[in-house]
Amino acid sequence: MQIDDKMLEKLEKLSALKIPDQNREEFKSQLGKIVDFVDILNELDLDGIEATVSTIGGGTPFREDISKEGSVIDGILTHAPKKQNRYFEVPKIIE
């Protein structure tokens, strides 16, 4: 599939990105290669092949959920100009 300027502009809008003019041709080429690769994948005959969700036999092993106190918050709050309890105190911005 050929990615043209119109398609690239649509993708820019959807992704909320701005591609610099000097990179537009390179992006169109790379996106075209990605779409071509997906087309190749779509041509694969996967009839009779069961979908695989995980490669770990028996699923993901669970661990016990143990709560423990951490000192990360206290360390971060030492850099706060203002704090209240375990929270940053910031100026009110919405009235």
Curated annotation (Swiss-Prot):
EC number of the protein: 6.3.5.-
Q: Which Pfam families match?
A: GatC
State a single Gene Ontology molecular function: glutaminyl-tRNA synthase (glutamine-hydrolyzing) activity
Sorted alphabetically, the keyword list is: ATP-binding, Ligase, Nucleotide-binding, Protein biosynthesis
Tell me one GO biological process term: translation
Q: Does the keyword Nucleotide-binding apply?
A: yes
Per its record, the protein catalyses: L-glutamyl-tRNA(Gln) + L-glutamine + ATP + H2O = L-glutaminyl-tRNA(Gln) + L-glutamate + ADP + phosphate + H(+); L-aspartyl-tRNA(Asn) + L-glutamine + ATP + H2O = L-asparaginyl-tRNA(Asn) + L-glutamate + ADP + phosphate + 2 H(+)
Quaternary structure note: Heterotrimer of A, B and C subunits.
Q: Which HAMAP family match?
A: GatC
- Cross-referenced PANTHER family, in alphabetical order? GLUTAMYL-TRNA(GLN) AMIDOTRANSFERASE SUBUNIT C, MITOCHONDRIAL
Q: Which family does it belong to?
A: Belongs to the GatC family.
* Protein function: Allows the formation of correctly charged Asn-tRNA(Asn) or Gln-tRNA(Gln) through the transamidation of misacylated Asp-tRNA(Asn) or Glu-tRNA(Gln) in organisms which lack either or both of asparaginyl-tRNA or glutaminyl-tRNA synthetases. The reaction takes place in the presence of glutamine and ATP through an activated phospho-Asp-tRNA(Asn) or phospho-Glu-tRNA(Gln).
Q: What is this protein called?
A: Aspartyl/glutamyl-tRNA(Asn/Gln) amidotransferase subunit C
Organism the protein comes from: Campylobacter fetus subsp. fetus (strain 82-40)
Give the gene symbol.
gatC
